[in-house]
């Protein structure tokens, strides 16, 4: 048997992982500015944590979850999304307690799992970056969180992004709209796709965002949620729209957008960009004021979003955006002869302990091959260390770009390479 990675997964090799590290680090920096702190939850949860919160009738639960019974006969699932685990953690760890500052702001990053057909930007093990804010029902929280997502996408370089905005209202508004939608779609049931016929019985709002052609035709004249908002829901949505306009964040009202998870209420949103004629959602989220109470906590407002790292990187690649990744070595040490082996190890360690990114040859190769390695590593400086240099205690340090050289002692390199580095035209941080 040929051992290969499972279908729908990928190996993220060094050339790619540098991009991942950049995106993750960039997200952390943006989130810190908004006073978010990281939370890390298990990659598997009890099945009910996901099924009951996401919705028993959603595609995630009915078709896509990786679930199994462990050796203790506990029903376990690999997490398919990030919000439910964070809410579970919030409640279990009593972060709703009065002594915890509100709103409580958390971000997470990590792998998620869904059994679906693998395609570009969508894998069975995928990675998500997300945020969750607990304790504020203020529409300004909706807008701040959406603005933070827009801030991140703009600064990382995603182009042509459009914000699609909708509201699902409060539970009363949503229930009234749900019934109106059932009344509208029931006479059209036979024209719907098989999936949407099932959705009509279980979760009729999901018919609205079906990608099937026949479903799109059926919902063209469907009633709008905006016509079923009560005063509270209308006031909240009006405030969100006004504050987005105040911040200069453009948006499109999309009344057919409902999101795929059952826990949303009031504001929902997606950031969408067009790639090769297809609309791709790069970031999405919304408000979920009932989820904390559903998990056994007190009534607590919530708002958050998630974005897929694979899809984000795919869009950046398709748009020709080059991330500013620094892969260059500061120093490469070419080693000549067995007599220089031990000293080369001492020297490279001393450089690393001073904060320099350094490498040396370990393979006793000819100098030409070692110099080629220095070029592959884009080494800024090059030191050639042979037995004669070890004996004399003096060595040449070369700027590998300009070929400028300086003669220095091994002791100086070991104790203060910064001075030499700067003399050759480079700057230390």
UniProtKB/Swiss-Prot annotation:
UniProt xrefs under PANTHER family: HISTIDINE--TRNA LIGASE, MITOCHONDRIAL-RELATED, HISTIDYL-TRNA SYNTHETASE
Enzyme Commission code: 6.1.1.21
GO biological process: histidyl-tRNA aminoacylation
SUPFAM superfamilies associated with the record: Class II aaRS ABD-related (SSF52954), Class II aaRS and biotin synthetases (SSF55681)
NCBIfam families documented for this protein: hisS
PROSITE patterns linked: AA_TRNA_LIGASE_II
GO molecular function, one term: transferase activity
Gene this chain is encoded by: hisS
InterPro entries membership: aa-tRNA-synth_II, aa-tRNA-synth_II/BPL/LPL, Anticodon-bd, Anticodon-bd_dom_sf, His-tRNA-ligase, HisRS-like_core, HisRS/HisZ, HisRS_anticodon
Keywords assigned by UniProt, alphabetized: Aminoacyl-tRNA synthetase, ATP-binding, Cytoplasm, Ligase, Nucleotide-binding, Protein biosynthesis
Annotated compartments: Cytoplasm
Highest taxon of the lineage: Bacteria
Organism: Streptococcus pneumoniae (strain Hungary19A-6)
Family: Belongs to the class-II aminoacyl-tRNA synthetase family.
Reaction(s) the record says it catalyses: tRNA(His) + L-histidine + ATP = L-histidyl-tRNA(His) + AMP + diphosphate + H(+)
Name of the protein in question: Histidine--tRNA ligase
GO CC terms, sorted: cytoplasm
A Pfam family this chain is assigned to: tRNA-synt_His
Subunit structure: Homodimer.
């Amino acid at each position: 048997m040929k051992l290969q990675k499972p279908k729908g997964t990928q190996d993220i090799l060094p050339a790619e992982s540098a991009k991942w590290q950049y995106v993750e680090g960039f997200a952390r920096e943006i989130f810190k500015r908004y006073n978010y702190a990281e939370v890390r939850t298990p990659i598997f949860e009890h099945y009910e944590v996901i099924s009951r919160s996401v919705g028993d009738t959603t595609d995630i639960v009915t078709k896509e979850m990786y679930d199994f019974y462990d050796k203790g006969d506990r029903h376990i699932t690999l997490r398919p999304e990030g919000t439910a685990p964070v809410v579970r953690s919030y409640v279990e760890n009593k972060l709703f307690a009065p002594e915890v500052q509100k709103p409580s702001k958390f971000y997470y990053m990590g792998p998620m799992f869904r059994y679906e057909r693998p395609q570009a930007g969508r894998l069975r093990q995928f990675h998500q970056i997300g945020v969750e804010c607990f304790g504020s029902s203020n529409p300004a929280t909706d807008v701040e969180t959406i603005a933070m997502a827009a801030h991140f996408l703009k600064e990382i370089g995603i182009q042509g992004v459009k914000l699609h905005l909708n509201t699902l209202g409060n539970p009363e508004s949503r229930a009234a709209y749900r019934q109106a939608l059932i009344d509208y779609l029931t006479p059209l049931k036979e024209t719907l796709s098989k999936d949407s016929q099932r959705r009509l019985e279980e979760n009729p709002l999901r018919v609205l965002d079906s990608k099937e052609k026949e479903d799109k035709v059926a919902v063209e004249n469907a009633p709008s949620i905006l016509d079923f908002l009560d005063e509270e829901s209308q006031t909240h949505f009006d405030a969100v729209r006004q504050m987005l306009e105040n911040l200069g964040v453009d948006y499109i009202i999309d009344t057919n957008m409902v999101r795929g998870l059952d826990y949303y209420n009031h504001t929902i949103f997606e950031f969408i960009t067009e790639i090769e004629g297809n609309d791709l959602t790069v970031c999405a989220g919304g408000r979920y004021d009932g989820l904390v109470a559903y998990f056994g906590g007190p009534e607590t407002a919530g708002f958050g979003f998630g974005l897929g790292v694979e899809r984000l990187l795919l869009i950046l690649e398709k748009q020709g955006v080059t991330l500013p990744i620094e892969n260059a070595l500061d120093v490469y040490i070419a080693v000549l002869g067995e007599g220089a082996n031990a000293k080369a190890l001492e020297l490279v360690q001393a450089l690393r302990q001073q904060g320099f990114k350094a490498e040396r040859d370990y393979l006793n190769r000819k100098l030409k091959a070692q110099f080629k390695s220095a070029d592959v590593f884009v080494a800024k400086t090059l030191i050639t260390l042979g037995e004669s240099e070890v004996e004399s205690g003096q060595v040449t340090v070369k700027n590998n770009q300009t070929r400028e050289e300086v003669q220095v002692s091994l002791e100086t390199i070991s104790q203060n390479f910064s001075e030499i580095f700067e003399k050759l035209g480079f700057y230390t941080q």
